[in-house]
Every structure is written in C-alpha cells, then in structure tokens.
Curated annotation (Swiss-Prot):
Function comment: Excises uracil residues from the DNA which can arise as a result of misincorporation of dUMP residues by DNA polymerase or due to deamination of cytosine.
InterPro entries: UDG_fam1 (IPR002043), Ura-DNA_Glyclase_AS (IPR018085), Uracil-DNA_glycosylase-like (IPR005122), Uracil-DNA_glycosylase-like_sf (IPR036895)
GO cellular component: cytoplasm
Claim: Cytoplasm is one of the keywords in the record: yes
Reactions the enzyme catalyzes: Hydrolyzes single-stranded DNA or mismatched double-stranded DNA and polynucleotides, releasing free uracil
Enzyme Commission number(s) of this protein: 3.2.2.27
Major location (coarse): cytoplasm
Organism from which the protein derives: Citrobacter koseri (strain ATCC BAA-895 / CDC 4225-83 / SGSC4696)
Assigned keywords, A-Z: Cytoplasm, DNA damage, DNA repair, Hydrolase
Protein's name according to its UniProt entry: Uracil-DNA glycosylase
Family stated for the protein in its record: Belongs to the uracil-DNA glycosylase (UDG) superfamily. UNG family.
HAMAP family membership: UDG
Top-level taxonomy: Bacteria, Pseudomonadati, Pseudomonadota, Gammaproteobacteria, Enterobacterales
DNA damage as UniProt keyword: yes
C-alpha cells in the first residue's frame, strides 16, 4: 500500500514536541561548546532525505552512529567513500557474497544506493560524541525513532524489517507482523555474527518477499553515486 504522505507531513508535529526541541538544543550546544559531534549537522537526517516515506521497502535498524573521524553520514552501517569499511558492514558483505550469486565485495562502505532504492538505514540514536559510543543515548533520539518506526508500520504495507541484535529486536516489537515481514538475526558485529547472522539469508529473503508483493527487488551491490549515473 503506497502512501502520498511525506516524512515532513507525518513528523511535523513530532518535531514540535518539547523532548525533540530539547534533543536538538542539547546537540547544538555541544557543537557550539567545541565538542565534535558526528555526523555533521547537515547529515543527521540523511536517512529521511534519501528514502522518502512513500518509498520505504526495507528497514535496517542500527544503534548509534560511528564515532570515528569522517565515518558517520546519517545512514546506519554506511561510511563515506574513502573511509575503511567497518567490521559489521564487512560481515554484511560476507553474507551477501555467500547468498547472492555474482555479488562481489565493494572496496567502499557507502550505502547511499541502497537508501535510494527504498532501504531506510535508520540508527536509533542519530548523533554521538567523537570517540564516545552511546554518548547521546537517552537524549531523546530513541523516542523520535520509535515514532518513525510506528509511522512506517502505520502508513506502509509489506515492508521488510531486518532486525539484527537484541537492541533492534526490542525496538521492533511494535511492528505489526500481519502487515509487514520481520526477519531477526544476531548483530553482524564480529562479536556475534557467527551466532547466526552468517547464513541468515536475510538479503535474499527480503528480495523474495518484495517480488512476491509486486515490488522491484533491491540491488544489494553498493555503487558510488558517480558509478550509478
């Protein structure tokens, strides 16, 4: 079921809520005080910029942004071109190599091409202090991204949710399994990938579901913008 509603339509009220205003104020204050916060301000909402609500086919939930220099740019698991591919994403590529014929691991970790095909790459917390994982947990971002998930649940039909690890699985508890396709596995991080992420076949299952429901499957081979033009 398509929707003509945009993120702007469905999130306008949420962005007026005191908790959300406070979240933005806190993050802006840290930046102004000289702290380095990732991703850069212009990139914080890129997941919504690249994947409009009406185009969402797949949701992949991350946790909080990468906290190293130049990595985070607003898409979960993705890093900018020229930045080394992080371990969790490398493991995602390994799973793709073993499950999708012809997939060859790219030399980059930039997933904008996934986002532009309808893969919402959503971190549950949208900012982080440099070098301090989870430093912006409990600022209010979780409330906002809970709302985002509930809006996808409500306004879209037949979305594939890929929930990797207990954090994402708890976050996805509200999803209506009668209307959407929920796939669960351990997180692709090196700590847990061997406990069942490898071999989960989620990328294949997602595409099978999309095709069965009349949607174009995702091309999981990440391409840089210049390559796709």
């Amino acid at each position: 079921m398509a929707t003509d509603l945009t993120w702007h339509d469905v999130l306008a009220d949420e962005k007026q809520q005191p908790y959300f205003v406070n979240t933005l104020h806190t993050v802006a204050g840290e930046r102004q005080s000289g702290m380095t916060v990732y991703p850069p301000q212009k990139d914080v909402f890129n997941a919504f910029r690249f994947t409009e609500l009406g185009n969402v086919k797949v949701v992949i939930l991350g946790q909080d942004p990468y906290h190293g220099p130049g990595q985070a740019h607003g898409l979960a698991f993705s890093v900018r071109p020229g930045i080394a591919t992080p371990p969790s994403l490398l493991n995602m590529y390994k799973e793709l190599e073993t499950s999708i014929p012809g997939f060859t691991r790219p030399a980059h970790g930039y997933l904008e091409s996934w986002a532009r095909q309808g893969v919402l790459l959503l971190n549950t917390v949208l900012t982080v202090r440099a070098g301090q994982a989870h430093s912006h947990a409990s600022l209010g971002w979780e409330t906002f991204t809970d709302k985002v998930i509930s809006l996808v649940n409500e306004h879209r039909e037949g979305v594939v949710f890929l929930l990797w690890g207990s954090h994402a699985q708890k976050k996805g508890a509200i999803i209506d399994r009668q209307r959407h396709y929920v796939l669960r596995a351990p997180h692709p991080s090196p700590l847990s990938a061997h406990r069942g992420f490898f071999g989960c076949n989620h990328f294949v299952l997602a595409n099978q579901w999309l095709e069965q429901h009349g949607e174009k499957p995702i091309d999981w081979m990440p391409v840089l913008p210049a390559e796709s033009e």
